[in-house]
Curated annotation (Swiss-Prot):
ATP binds at residue 331. This is Probable methionine--tRNA ligase, cytoplasmic. A motif ('HIGH' region) lies at residues 10-20. Its main location: cytoplasm. CDD domains: MetRS_core. Keywords: Aminoacyl-tRNA synthetase, ATP-binding, Cytoplasm, Ligase, Nucleotide-binding, Protein biosynthesis. InterPro entries: aa-tRNA-synth_I_CS, Anticodon_Met, Met-tRNA_ligase_1, Met-tRNA_synth, Methionyl/Leucyl_tRNA_Synth, MetRS_core, MetRS_Zn, Rossmann-like_a/b/a_fold. It comes from the Eukaryota. GO terms for molecular function: ATP binding; methionine-tRNA ligase activity. It is found in: Cytoplasm. It catalyses: tRNA(Met) + L-methionine + ATP = L-methionyl-tRNA(Met) + AMP + diphosphate. It comes from Encephalitozoon cuniculi (strain GB-M1). SUPFAM superfamilies: Anticodon-binding domain of a subclass of class I aminoacyl-tRNA synthetases, Methionyl-tRNA synthetase (MetRS), Zn-domain, Nucleotidylyl transferase. GO terms for cellular component: aminoacyl-tRNA synthetase multienzyme complex; cytosol.
Amino acid sequence: MKKFITSALPYVNNQPHLGNIIGSVLSGDVYSRYCKKKGEVSVYICGTDEYGTAIEMEAISQGVTPLEICEKNRKLHKQVYDWFNIDFDYFGFTSSATHTGLVQDLFMKMYDNGHFSEVEIEQFYCEHCGLFLADRFIVGECKFCGDGRARGDQCDSCGHTYNSLELLSPRCSICSSSPVVRATTHLFFDLEAFRPSLEELYRTNGHLWSQNAQNIFRQWISMEFYPRCMTRDLKFNWGVPVPLEKFKEKVFYVWFDAPIGYLTFLKELVGEDFGEWCKDAELVQFMGKDNVAFHTVIFPAMLYATGEKYPVVRRLSATEYLQFENEKFSKSRRHGIFGLDLVGGGLGKSCMWRYYLLKIRPESTKDSNFTFSDFRQSVTADLINNLGNFVNRVLKYIQSKCNSRVSLLELDSGDKKCIEDVNELYCKYKAKMEEIKLREALQVVMEICRRGNEYIQEGVRSRDRKGHFFCLGFSIIGLVGTLLHPFIPVTSLEILRMCNLEETMFPESMRIVDGHTMGSDIRPLFEDFTTEQIEEMKRYDRPQSTGCSK
């Protein structure tokens, strides 16, 4: 079965921080590379989410149009992902004509099937600004947790969603004045009608979701579903227009149009084969835990409401939050590392950052914490002393003592035990990757390196078979080079280049290399941080400008 792999669409009002990167695009990239390395037919798709109130607010604050914000920040996002070597098969954007057409088409199917109703509601209205206050245009105190920065549709602090009129002490986000309440008519989606279908979805696929995703779904499905308002009154009408005459001045709620973006980008990529992909592709999705409810409840219900065959989530991997130095990332307080901080290379190479973010990937049910001290220690201990030392030591020995020729003696019981140990670890690696436990799979690769180092150390004491030990260690390096491809692909290629080995699919077991001439240009895989880089890291111990819009 083909795999349709997606990462939660990054919102384009700002550049991504480290938590955004590990939570969706980097995790999706690792899994996509793994699937392709297995020989599976798969596509990895993402793109920028460009509609909604956050974009309008940013445009108002900067005195430009929403489109200008999107076009500028879209390039910044792609620049960051390119630096991280994220290998999308397609990266699109939701403000395209193709997306508008598909959203309107799917809506009309849902509407014609009777799953929307017109409801007159009361909504906050700012008389000073002359507009209805939807979502981020209204802020106030959350009635659930008391946070004073809750938005009109959701509290980022506790995760609750609600009607904006439930906010306490509401105020306009633009001018801070107190709003009045006015009547307006919107379109509401009958979510409750799809409870049985959603329960069946969970029974069928829920065991393939990360534990936190399962917990969130069960929490939602235990509650009463209220009709969901799927249209908005916005100042610039920045969104997909509602294709009904009565609602021509309104646009769709961003969480209605954004997930359809996955289908838009798939359609833009595969063209006439779109229908076939919709029929038999397995949808695998990566996201932070705050997006789980939209992807396991609301979006699947929308697809069911069309009455047609579209891929619904089969596998889902959701991360917990990544903190920065024991605090939440904050754009307003300039707390954390953001994408453009890394692009210049002043804080280290991308392979180091890929490795460390995946090492601390918050894939259990607990948040993870980024610290520069642990980052530096991990690079030194894992990449330089373990992986780098193992590769360099073996290759340098074969180059200088064996004339770059890998030549084995007859395998003895100790050799066979080492091979058995490595193959057991390789099986564990494959199992963890299938479970999308990426952090644990990466740990297994480091275990293989440690086992290889132990084996080589045994060989140092053997006068007659010392060269043989190093030559068998070469086979371990070849396997490690392949297994690292999903995680740190540039390093993987460098290992294979020095070994003079071709890129291959994942083997059934470790291939024993004999009678082979390795490469001649052997270099250290990693270099320690420079004094300048360490000094640059120290700058982030205090508030810094991220170089992005607030």
